[in-house]
């Protein structure tokens, strides 16, 4: 399984959530609404989730092993850094996405 596209939508509001991401796998399957969060130990990703009637959050889609989670997180955070730097240098403030 290869990550074939990462699309970053930066969040301009102040807060811990920095971006919302869509990731495409093998040009065939996409997962939307992955969040880039600023935590105490740096950036990390949160998979898309929904709130249950009991108030608990359950992932809608998620990797089933650590290796895959790390692969997805690295691809997202690497692309986030590129987009963050490009946006800083973009005078028009346009949204920037990247396709691999």
UniProtKB/Swiss-Prot annotation:
Sorted UniProt keywords: Cell cycle, Cell division, Septation
Any one Pfam family match given in the protein's UniProt record, by short name: SpoVG
Species assigned in the record: Clostridium novyi (strain NT)
Known role: Could be involved in septation.
GO BP terms, alphabetized: division septum assembly; sporulation resulting in formation of a cellular spore
NCBIfam families in alphabetical order: PRK13259.1 (NF009749)
This protein's name: Putative septation protein SpoVG
Family: Belongs to the SpoVG family.
Top-level division of the source organism's lineage: Bacteria
